[in-house]
Amino acid sequence: MDHRMENTEEERPEKNDAKDSIMNKIQQLGETTLPQLPQDTNIHCLTIIGQIEGHVQLPPQNKTTKYEHVIPQIVAIEQNPKIEGLLIILNTVGGDVEAGLAIAEMLASLSKPTVSIVLGGGHSIGVPIAVSCDYSYIAETATMTIHPVRLTGLVIGVPQTFEYLDKMQERVVKFVTSHSNITEEKFKELMFSKGNLTRDIGTNVVGKDAVKYGLIDHAGGVGQAINKLNELIDEARKEEGRMIQ
């Protein structure tokens, strides 16, 4: 009798923990079970969502991607021999220019195959991140906003500040044009276009138009992006095999 009571008491906490875990999943994710990546997967998925946070902390209600979280992940991906390819999923409104460029530069310098896909939006400084990979995709309904670098809500009254922003803008233009098929002339034309955006300068590029301009390589979805990444991984393996021989 005593043994049965002891077993029952031991089982109760485990059942309560299981119930709490299920309730947490329902509250946070709306699901009781979640699909998991296999342990032996050779592809890592990195999501860049919301606003890219730089040196200034954004309000807690904002969904953000913190560059100090992303950069160590990119370093770990480069060093991990089990990871052979990286899939970048973008749905960002933009954010800190220098933080976004830092992420884009790191992605462009990876020795492993990389593929990006823009879902929803890849606006502002999200554009350099989208083009930083070896191959880029955009969903047909996704958009990319191209506009000049600016300080939100401030009037630029000091010439040095204007010059600094102008140089930063040139860095963005140079990076995008050197990592995609769009020309500098066309990119600047889209950037300084008037009448496309309400009360702003710039252009909102949708889906296949981004491909037409040479900004993105292909219009497609997650399945196509993963297939392309696997192709690039196979090519990298063959190249490595040739070097060893």
Swiss-Prot record:
> What are the GO cellular component annotations?
cytoplasm
Stretches for region Disordered: 1-20
Keywords, ordered alphabetically? Cytoplasm, Hydrolase, Protease, Protein transport, Translocation, Transport
Q: Where in the cell is it found?
A: Cytoplasm
Q: Where is the signal peptide?
A: none
Q: Report the record's Gene Ontology biological process terms.
A: protein transport; proteolysis
The active-site annotation reads S124, H147
GO MF, one term, reads: peptidase activity
| Residue pairs linked by disulfide bridges in the UniProt entry | none
Where it mainly occurs, coarsely classed, is cytoplasm
Q: What does this protein do?
A: Required for efficient translocation of pre-proteins across the membrane.
Homology family? Belongs to the peptidase S14 family. TepA subfamily.
Name of the protein described by the UniProt record: Translocation-enhancing protein TepA
Source organism of the structure: Bacillus subtilis (strain 168)
Name the gene. Answer: tepA
